[in-house]
Amino acid sequence: MKKPFRIGFGFDVHRLSEGYPLWMGGVRLEHSKGLEGHSDADVLIHAICDALLGAAALRDIGYHFPPSDPQYKGIDSKILLARAMELVRSQGYELGNIDATIAAEQPKLNPHIPDMQRVLAEVIQVEVSDISLKATTTEKLGFTGREEGISAYAVALLIAAV
């Protein structure tokens, strides 16, 4: 019997480096550094993908879209998010909601949250109110505090489709 609700958790981190664009939640942000990665390194979308896939017991983003596969080199993470949501829907689930937190000292992300919510909701095909995003710092502690990288955490609630 299919469970009526499933919850998944996702986490991702990428190194900040000069010479890369900074993508966050599908929105390109102006900053002196960007995130390194095989794809566009959008840590927020990657954490959300892992939360969605985990909730549906479909493993993780690296399993479905491995960095060893050249077709994913430089890919727009919004494409990965759309595919992850297709996989979730193929299992008979719809999104209840997402709650995610981004940890970064710079740039300040709060002004960009409404744009990120709109982009993510459009890609996943849900209401903006189904996407909760928060930004925090680590009070200058650890690799995020030293501005060496950015991390993101996400929880997704799935609801059995009727």
From Swiss-Prot:
This protein's UniProt keywords: Isoprene biosynthesis, Lyase, Metal-binding
Enzyme Commission number(s) of this protein: 4.6.1.12
SUPFAM superfamilies named among the record's database cross-references: IpsF-like (SSF69765)
PROSITE patterns listed in its UniProt record: ISPF
Residues at which a divalent metal cation binds: 12, 14, 46
Role this protein plays: Involved in the biosynthesis of isopentenyl diphosphate (IPP) and dimethylallyl diphosphate (DMAPP), two major building blocks of isoprenoid compounds. Catalyzes the conversion of 4-diphosphocytidyl-2-C-methyl-D-erythritol 2-phosphate (CDP-ME2P) to 2-C-methyl-D-erythritol 2,4-cyclodiphosphate (ME-CPP) with a corresponding release of cytidine 5-monophosphate (CMP).
Sites annotated Transition state stabilizer: 38, 137
Taxonomic placement: Bacteria, Pseudomonadati, Bacteroidota, Bacteroidia, Bacteroidales
Protein name: 2-C-methyl-D-erythritol 2,4-cyclodiphosphate synthase
GO MF entries: 2-C-methyl-D-erythritol 2,4-cyclodiphosphate synthase activity; metal ion binding
Cofactor note: Binds 1 divalent metal cation per subunit.
HAMAP family on file: IspF (MF_00107)
Gene that this polypeptide is encoded by: ispF
